[in-house]
């Protein structure tokens, strides 16, 4: 047996596939990381572009509105309950989906001290009532044709849902409606009901 020196060229060739695999893996990891960072940044910018809701953390403006069923409803009479106000219009396409989701919330959490009110901003109360009836709404519908309550709650998009805690403080606002925003809304609602 003779002593052989390792061939440097052969040694490099044997190492190249490992280096290439590592390099390809590193590139893939960096690409995925940059993609996730980009997505996070895009979501953050989208939320940053949304104007802040000035009433968050402040007392909810009191109001009295006429309900479609005939009675008057005053918000301050619901202290001690978690109140959901959903601003909607019969001309809003995503309002129907949101009202159905709120119906499910009421069915699930009514016994925990939850009151849900739909605040219709339609100019025509009859049209608002027909829309709510066709949507199968099971909670009280309040009529705000002059939009005074909508203005006091700074409603700038429909649908818009406002969560008010048992002390009468605005705690969460959901602008528009999507599966993702609905998930966050339900988390916020559960938190308030457990306080």
Task: Outline where the language-model segments fall.
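Short active-site neighborhood of thiol/selenol oxidoreductases, capturing the structured segment around
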Residues: 76-93
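Thiol/disulfide oxidoreductase modules built on the thioredoxin-like
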Residues: 130-137, 145-190
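Bacterial N-terminal signal peptides
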Residues: 26-44
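N-terminal "domain-start" segment that seeds a small globular fold
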Residues: 47-75
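Structural microenvironment flanking redox-active thiols in thiol-disulfide oxidoreductases
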Residues: 96-135, 145-152
């Amino acid at each position: 047996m003779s002593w052989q020196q390792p061939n440097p060229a052969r040694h490099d060739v044997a190492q190249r596939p490992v280096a290439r695999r590592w390099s390809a893996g590193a590139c893939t990891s960096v690409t995925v990381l940059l993609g996730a960072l980009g997505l996070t940044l895009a979501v953050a910018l989208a939320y940053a572009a949304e104007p802040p809701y000035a009433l968050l953390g402040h007392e909810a403006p009191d109001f009295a509105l006429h309900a479609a069923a005939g009675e008057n409803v005053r918000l301050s009479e619901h202290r001690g309950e978690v109140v959901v106000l959903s601003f909607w219009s019969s001309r809003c396409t995503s309002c129907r989906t949101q009202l159905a989701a709120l119906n499910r919330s009421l069915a699930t959490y009514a016994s925990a001290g939850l009151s849900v009110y739909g605040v219709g901003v339609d100019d025509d109360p009859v049209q608002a009532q027909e829309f709510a009836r066709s949507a199968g709404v099971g909670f009280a519908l309040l009529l705000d044709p002059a939009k005074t309550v909508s203005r006091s709650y700074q409603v700038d998009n429909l649908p818009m849902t406002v969560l008010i805690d048992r002390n009468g403080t605005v705690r969460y606002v959901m602008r528009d409606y999507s599966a993702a925003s609905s998930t966050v809304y339900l988390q916020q609602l559960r938190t308030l009901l457990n306080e």
